[in-house]
A protein has these predicted regions:
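Lipid deacylating catalytic domains
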Residues: 1-159
């Protein structure tokens, strides 16, 4: 599990790249990882092999892995698949105006992929009345927010 609270990665198009197009190009080139990973279009022999061992369904042509020649029927995730085996939960507090909520954070799934579960505290509880970027763990959180934090962390992996 990866849990981010108040992550500035919502602004990745200027924190990690020169523009939204540059960010997308870097992700496509696997310089920056996405969740789920961007698949690699496989060669015909790789496609046949992947389908034969059940890794791909008919019609699919890409995979986030490549054949591992040292292991029979083994495949290895490519370097851009860092989040392939990760459950990513992003908790943020939607900002209204400058000082209500967390202007620094925001949803991550639009920039990094639909494998990220974004949890907006303003929708779970109510709009914050003050700046909250450094207050996620303050003792005066509402019951709804504390429950959201506990469920995101879910150390015992309970449903």
């Amino acid at each position: 599990d990866l849990i981010t609270f108040g992550s500035p990665l919502t602004h990745a198009e200027f924190l990690l790249a020169r523009s939204k197009n540059d960010l997308e190009a870097r992700q496509k080139d696997r310089e920056l990882a996405t969740c789920p990973p961007i698949g690699e279009v496989l060669d015909e022999w790789q496609l046949e092999h992947a389908r034969a061992i059940g890794l791909l369904e008919e019609g699919q042509a890409s995979l986030s892995a490549f054949p591992d020649r040292q292991v029979k029927d083994g495949w290895t995730l490519h370097h851009g698949a860092a989040f392939a085996v990760v459950r990513w939960t992003n908790v943020h507090d939607h900002a209204k105006f400058i000082f209500c909520g967390d202007l620094i954070s925001g949803p991550l799934s639009p920039a990094f992929g639909q494998g990220i579960e974004d949890r907006d505290l303003a929708k779970i509880d109510k709009q914050s009345a003050s700046f909250t970027h450094t207050r996620y763990w303050s003792a005066d959180q509402s019951r709804e927010r504390l429950t959201t934090f506990r469920n995101a962390i879910n150390v015992l992996d309970e449903d």
